[in-house]
């Protein structure tokens, strides 16, 4: 039996990604999805949230493919090239997990890739760089430092102070853009 859950609502994360995608894509847009694994519940939830929000908000948007990359940048690179070669009018890529560097590398060698909007999860050095270079439009974060802090704090309060935590301690979905990490000129 678990004490509580500290983390992000991944379904909400997928819906957030879709909501952003709906705002930036043209009418009748086409999106390719790269999912870490269809067997991991967090990625299943992100995908379901994304699909549901797209169908509710922008039924004109078509999801043209869902491919697994097992968080590997090499597979994300290959999948991105496949999407772009098969669908020269691809408008967006949503990646639910790791491997964003592979998407960035593939888009570097594709003509007209500046017309492809990309949304990913997790703020890493790689995803921040891709934000700064405007390859990625949005990165959704889950505040890993805050999650770790809340885990220790909750455990301490439970063990030392005998305070029973809420069953769910939700970590909000954060949204980062290129402006979030722009270096200021002196």
Regions from the PLM with identified roles:
Residues 13-17, 41-60, 75, 79, ...:
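Short, solvent-exposed amphipathic alpha-helices that sit
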Residues 6-29, 76-77, 127, 143-160:
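Hydrophobic alpha-helical segments within soluble ligand-binding/sensing domains
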Residues 3-4, 30-39:
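Short beta-strand segments enriched in small/hydrophobic residues
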Residues 34, 94-95, 176:
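Short hydrophobic segments within beta-strands
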């Amino acid at each position: 039996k678990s004490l509580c859950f500290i983390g992000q609502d991944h379904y909400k994360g997928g819906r957030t990604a879709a909501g952003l995608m709906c705002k930036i894509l043209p009418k009748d847009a086409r999106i390719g999805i790269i999912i870490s694994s269809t067997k991991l519940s967090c990625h299943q939830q992100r995908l379901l949230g994304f699909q549901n929000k797209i169908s509710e908000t922008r039924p004109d948007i078509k999801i043209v493919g869902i491919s697994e990359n097992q968080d590997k940048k090499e597979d994300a690179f290959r999948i991105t090239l496949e999407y772009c070669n098969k669908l020269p009018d691809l408008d967006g890529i949503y990646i639910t997990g790791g491997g964003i560097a592979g998407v960035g590398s593939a888009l570097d060698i594709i003509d007209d890739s500046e017309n492809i909007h990309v949304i990913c999860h997790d703020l890493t050095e790689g995803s921040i760089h891709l934000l700064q270079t405007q390859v990625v439009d949005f990165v959704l974060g889950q505040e890993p430092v805050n999650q770790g802090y809340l885990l220790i704090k909750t455990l301490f309060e439970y063990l030392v102070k005998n305070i029973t935590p809420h069953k769910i301690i939700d970590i909000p979905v954060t949204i980062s853009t290129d402006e979030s990490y722009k270096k200021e000129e002196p």
